[in-house]
Design a protein with these regions (language model features):
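Short, structurally constrained coil/turn elements
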Residues: 1, 47, 72, 92-94, ...
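Conserved beta-strand hairpin/beta-sheet module of binuclear metal-dependent hydrolase folds
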Residues: 1-44
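Short secondary-structure boundary/capping segments
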Residues: 9, 18, 45, 68-70, ...
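A generic structural signal for short beta-strands and their flanking turns/coil linkers
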Residues: 15, 24, 50-52, 74, ...
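Divalent metal-coordination and catalytic microenvironments
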Residues: 19, 29, 58, 78, ...
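Short, glycine/charged-enriched secondary-structure capping and boundary segments
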Residues: 20-22, 41-44, 68-71, 92-95, ...
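Active-site metal-binding motif and surrounding structural segment of the metallo-beta-lactamase
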Residues: 34-84
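Metallo-beta-lactamase
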Residues: 82-116
Length: 116
């Protein structure tokens, strides 16, 4: 399986990385505004329109800020543990396409096997 992993940004102002495989485009955290994240993705030849999912490590804004702007992208699945999803949902005006999991679980997404 071929894959590409791009660090889009890392630090107190935001964290996000892009994982591209043959079957999926996944953001690992989304800690920038959706606009800024779109710019960062464009810098590596990608776009929010092409993202299939966001995997969130936790609820801090430097890891989850873009959720506010993902309302425009209902196809994007947002993976988080139940506690993280609950905390973030209280701050949002819409309901993302949550895909909740138990911490410690394993699951498949497209051609990826994920261990949490």
């Amino acid at each position: 399986m071929s894959m590409r992993f791009c660090i889009l940004g890392s630090g107190s102002s935001g964290n996000s990385a892009l994982l591209v495989t043959e079957g999926a485009r996944v953001l690992v955290d989304a800690g920038f505004s959706a606009r800024k994240l779109g710019q960062l993705l464009a810098g590596v030849g990608e776009s929010l329109e092409r993202v299939d999912a966001v995997f969130l490590s936790h609820e801090h804004s430097d890891h989850a800020e873009a959720l506010r702007g993902l309302k425009k992208f209902p196809q994007v699945r947002v993976f988080a543990n139940h506690a993280t999803a609950r905390v973030l949902q209280e701050k949002l005006e819409y309901r993302p396409n949550w895909q909740c999991f138990e911490t410690g679980a394993r699951f498949r997404f497209a051609d990826l096997e994920v261990e949490t």
